[in-house]
Amino acid sequence: MASTSCFLHQSTARLAASARPAPAVGRTQLFVCKAQKNDEAASDAAVVTSRRAALSLLAGAAAIAVKVSPAAAAYGEAANVFGKAKKNTDFVAYSGEGFKLMIPAKWNPSKEREFPGQVLRYEDNFDATSNLSVIINPTTKKTITDYGSPEEFLSQVGFLLGQQSYGGKTDSEGGFESDAVATANVLESSAPVVDGKQYYSITVLTRTADGDEGGKHQLITATVADGKLYVCKAQRDKRWFKGAKKFVENAAGSFSVA
């Protein structure tokens, strides 16, 4: 618009020349006007460029500073699509008769009673093979160590692993002994002390010759308190998929007796 104003000023000057003498606008003045406008346009362009560069720099810095969390989720977990912090809703606290533990939030209570003294049973609503039970029975023992070693204790509560009902002659495939259709192997055991109370923690792999040679992991946590034997038994399939393992192991590891 400044250049246009300059040309209009030149035309007005020519019309007024016949009426009164006036200094004509020279080429130098017109050139200066154009140059001044060009300088202003260049200045405006530079400002716009500087602003764009600043915004780009800020956006780049923000992208570097923010750590984006992946949206992928394991089995049983909710995807954190927008990267917002969320509370841990994977487990629910449960308090029973003298005991407490964390139960996977998506597990359902079960009315099935497998063992004498069973007071609680929950199972995975996707695969019932993953489940946990709490068993409470009276005992004359003062502490869990009165049962002997963890392996000796396990031999006295063999009902937790199931009893072989078949008594005939057989030679099953899969590494079973003659006339045996089930086997149990202790994978690891420990005797942790939690809040001054002695516990036994035992992991057992059980296998049967009924097409389940792959086996199941049995996680057993036990202690004695107030004349009672408290046992938490959690089970999972040996060949499980991503994510299921943590629910069973964390639930078994959270078991404690008051």
From Swiss-Prot:
Entry GO terms, CC: chloroplast thylakoid membrane; extrinsic component of membrane; photosystem II oxygen evolving complex
Transit peptide location on this chain: 1-73
Gene3D superfamilies in UniProt: Mog1/PsbP, alpha/beta/alpha sandwich
GO biological process assignments: photosynthesis
Database matches in InterPro entries: Mog1/PsbP_a/b/a-sand, PsbP_C
Keyword check for Chloroplast: yes
Subcellular location: Plastid, Chloroplast thylakoid membrane
UniProt keyword list: Chloroplast, Membrane, Photosynthesis, Photosystem II, Plastid, Thylakoid, Transit peptide
Protein name per Swiss-Prot or TrEMBL: Oxygen-evolving enhancer protein 2, chloroplastic
Induction and repression of expression: By light.
Lineage: Eukaryota, Viridiplantae, Streptophyta, Embryophyta, Tracheophyta
Gene name, Swiss-Prot/TrEMBL: PSBP
UniProt-listed PANTHER family: OXYGEN-EVOLVING ENHANCER PROTEIN 2-1, CHLOROPLASTIC, PTHR31407
Membrane is among the record's keywords: yes
Taxonomic superkingdom: Eukaryota
Purpose of the protein: May be involved in the regulation of photosystem II.
GO MF: calcium ion binding
Family that this chain belongs to: Belongs to the PsbP family.
